[in-house]
Curated annotation (Swiss-Prot):
One of its GO terms (molecular function) is RNA binding. This is Cleavage stimulation factor subunit 3. It is found in: Nucleus. InterPro entries: HAT (IPR003107), Rna14-like (IPR045243), Suf (IPR008847), TPR-like_helical_dom_sf (IPR011990). One of its GO terms (biological process) is co-transcriptional mRNA 3'-end processing, cleavage and polyadenylation pathway. Homodimer. The CSTF complex is composed of CSTF1 (50 kDa subunit), CSTF2 (64 kDa subunit) and CSTF3 (77 kDa subunit). CSTF3 directly interacts with CSTF1 and CSTF2. Interacts with FIP1L1. The modification Phosphoserine is found at residue 691. HAT repeats lie at residues 45-77, 79-110, 117-152, 163-196, 221-261, 271-303, 319-352, 354-387, 458-494. GO terms for cellular component: mRNA cleavage stimulating factor complex; nucleoplasm; nucleus. Its main location: nucleus. One of the multiple factors required for polyadenylation and 3'-end cleavage of mammalian pre-mRNAs. The gene is CSTF3. It comes from the Eukaryota.
């Protein structure tokens, strides 16, 4: 029993690093470092135990070919071929990753070799792969493998032999006009193949394809350049807004734009569209969480569909039109299930195709997601229903929105304005606003929308009554009423007399007495300001403690802004705002003006030199200024090396003998004494003297203790 318990404990043991990784993934499911730890752990476990981790991995990163390949290879290693084929069915069509497709071909080649129909299945697999991934810049090996496979197929009889030659030639000719790395080698192999079949026909066959090959080779060079630097194995994660990510996004868009520019210079719009969409598919493997890529891909398909329809190619036009809808469907079904932007674009696209039932299903599908705010969805849904089916259909959607407890006040505003502008019925709009006021009377944004509507109708009495109702009913908290009071004052300033203006100002001051105590002048600004014109300068407004509640509301980028009283002024100049982080004093910066050919010992850029030690400063003051010295400049390193090697005499007598030539005792480390006469003679020689001629005529033999030669010999050793 104890042994069984120990076995269970061992089976349940989880390494500490795995626990930490799991904790990180709870906080951020896209933490790649944590996933790397789990992947390494799974690779060291039996597949039955690791399968759960792999399933989580591909569920989190469904577009990552690298992760799918890891999962499939683990199943292949365990010989679970039935599971392998199911995995390929799940990912192969959706993930156009070159390594994943090579893994698929390798799997078919290794596991189907003993079947009677192996040759047919393998040929179908290669054709399928080239159709899907043949435009890949790294697809050369697949083309070569297919050709070698066809060459190796046994052909009995002349008919079968001709069939094989035709099949090989067809693949060669397709590959030689497809831009990719190593296209030159494929072309050379094709030339040899044709010459091996019939040298007389080969020349014409090659000439017929030569122009297209040269064009493809040129494009392949550009293709390789534009793809350089792209991280194509990166898993797709939500936008991180990092410089590295921005750089990758920019590079991907340049690649797509390059494909759109038609580098092959072909007139086949279908081929252009297929190449551009292949670029989009490659991009979406890495940037699948970026809605703009999905939208641009669908837009491009829609444009291509219209272009083909104009040319009369209705079949491909319909194909691309349906594929555009499929792009939207894939986006909202996989990585961007809650992205309203793509749902709305998808709905508009189907509306343009007059498929109204499909549009209804799209909106209802989004509304069925429980953990979203459906307000904007209902608003767009109402607008669609009114456009496509009339005002009555829009009212039905509004009724449905009122019954949904998740909706907010914006739905009432939209419905009221829709009634006013579309049915021209002010009374219906007024009733909707009144109905909403009962429910959202404590939300200043809704009250302001109602006020704007009444102001638009120029109904002064009703507007004034609304102001009084809202401000005196007690439904609106005082801390939220700041903008309502400001709008009331602006309203009276536009249409009321001075007495009514002063009355509103007094009531407003009473409502915010604690805030504006001692700052009565700040309230005076609101009486005279108009739009962005103020009766004081920005610094004066700041000194008054003035705050503009309308600007404060616009500046607050939050879903439900709350305008709370504050003694801190909101209106500030950019100059008055202090940075939130320390900044250098740019006035003290030295312009970057590097010296041209700076002499040794000086910095190429002025400034940045360390202060001179005090003792050296005293010495420098005693020396003549630098302008007095015109050269020659001493090589300091060599001079210091000579000083280091010199042996200084210990006594005065020894020094005198060396100077007077009494004894040649000037020595260098390990080199013995030096001939002093030669040194002195060389030292006193006149500069104008023709030393080269004298040395050639007389001093043929070098000195016995030549320092220079001794040093050179020492270096050689």
């Amino acid at each position: 029993m104890s042994g069984d318990g120990a076995t269970e404990q061992a089976a349940e043991y989880v390494p500490e690093k795995v626990k930490k990784a799991e904790k990180k993934l709870e906080e951020n499911p896209y933490d790649l470092d944590a996933w790397s730890i789990l992947i390494r752990e799974a690779q060291n476990q039996p597949i039955d135990k690791a399968r759960k981790t792999y399933e989580r991995l591909v569920a989190q990163f469904p577009s990552s070919g690298r992760f799918w390949k890891l999962y499939i290879e683990a199943e292949i290693k365990a010989k679970n071929y039935d599971k392998v084929e199911k995995l390929f069915q799940r990912c192969l069509m959706k993930v156009l990753h070159i390594d994943l497709w090579k893994c698929y071909l390798s799997y078919v080649r290794e596991t189907k070799g003993k079947l009677p129909s192996y040759k047919e299945k393998m040929a179908q697999a290669y054709d399928f792969a080239l159709d899907k991934i043949g435009m890949e810049i790294m697809s050369y090996q697949i083309w070569v493998d297919y050709i070698n496979f066809l060459k190796g197929v046994e052909a009995v009889g002349s008919y079968a032999e001709n069939q094989r030659i035709t099949a090989v030639r067809r693949v060669y000719q397709r590959g030689c006009v497809n831009p990719m790395i190593n296209i030159e080698q494929l072309w050379r192999d094709y030339n040899k193949y044709e010459e091996g079949i019939n040298i007389h026909l080969a020349k014409k066959m090659i000439e017929d394809r030569s122009r297209d090959y040269m064009n493809a080779r040129r494009v392949a060079k550009e293709y390789e350049t534009v793809m350089k630097g792209l991280d194509r194995n990166a898993p797709s994660v939500p936008p991180q807004n990092t410089p590295q990510e921005a750089q990758q996004v920019d590079m991907w868009k340049k690649y797509i734009q390059w494909e759109k520019s038609n580098p092959l210079r072909t007139e086949d719009q279908t081929l252009i569209t297929k190449r551009v969409m292949f670029a989009y598919e490659q991009c979406l493997l890495v940037l699948g969480h970026h809605p703009d890529i999905w939208y641009e891909a669908a837009q491009y398909l829609e444009q291509s569909s219209k272009l083909l329809a104009e040319k009369g190619d209705m079949n491909n036009a319909k194909l691309f039109s349906d594929e555009a809808a499929n792009i939207y469907e894939r986006a909202i079904s996989t990585l961007l299930k809650k992205n309203m932007l793509l749902y709305f674009a998808y709905a508009d696209y189907e509306e343009s195709r007059m498929k109204y039932e499909k549009v209804h299903s799209i909106y209802n599908r989004l509304l069925a997601i429980e953990d979203i705010d459906p307000t904007l969805v209902y608003i767009q849904y109402m607008k669609f229903a009114r456009r496509a089916e009339g005002i009555k259909s829009g009212r039905m959607i509004f009724k449905k929105a009122r019954e949904d407890t998740r909706t907010r006040h914006h739905v009432y505003v939209t419905a009221a304005l829709m009634e006013y502008y579309c049915s021209k019925d002010k009374s219906v709009a007024f009733k909707i606003f009144e109905l909403g006021l009962k429910k959202y009377g404590d939300i200043p944004e809704y009250v302001l929308a109602y006020i704007d509507y009444l102001s638009h109708l120029n109904e002064d009495n009703n507007t004034r009554v609304l102001f009084e109702r809202v401000l005196t009913s007690g439904s609106l908290p005082p801390e939220k009423s700041g903008e309502i009071w400001a709008r009331f004052l602006a309203f009276e300033s536009n249409i009321g007399d001075l007495a009514s203006i002063l009355k509103v100002e007094k009531r407003r001051f009473t409502a915010f007495k604690e805030e504006y105590e001692g700052k009565e002048t700040a309230l005076l600004v609101d009486r005279y300001k108009f739009m962005d014109l103020y009766p004081c300068s920005a610094s004066e407004l700041k000194a008054l403690g003035y705050k503009d509640v309308s600007r404060a509301k616009l500046a607050a980028i939050i879903p439900d802004p709350v305008v709370a009283p504050s003694i801190v002024p909101v209106l500030k100049d950019e100059v008055d705002r202090k940075p939130e982080y320390p900044k250098p004093d740019t006035q003290q910066m030295i312009p970057f003006q590097p010296r041209h050919l700076a002499p040794p010992g000086l910095h190429p850029v002025p400034g940045g030199v360390f202060p001179v030690p005090p003792a050296a400063v005293v010495l420098m003051k005693l020396l003549p200024p630098p302008i007095c010295f015109q050269g020659p400049f001493v090589q300091v390193d060599e001079l210091m090396e000579i000083f280091r090697r010199c042996k200084i005499p210990n006594t005065v007598e020894e020094a005198v003998r060396i100077i007077t030539g009494g004894a040649p005792e000037l020595a260098v480390e390990g080199n013995g004494p030096v001939e002093s006469n030669a040194v002195l003679t060389k030292a006193v020689k006149r500069p104008n003297e023709d030393s080269d001629e004298d040395e050639e005529k007389g001093a043929v033999v070098p000195p016995v203790h030549d320092i220079y030669r001794a040093r050179q010999q020492k270096r050689i050793r």
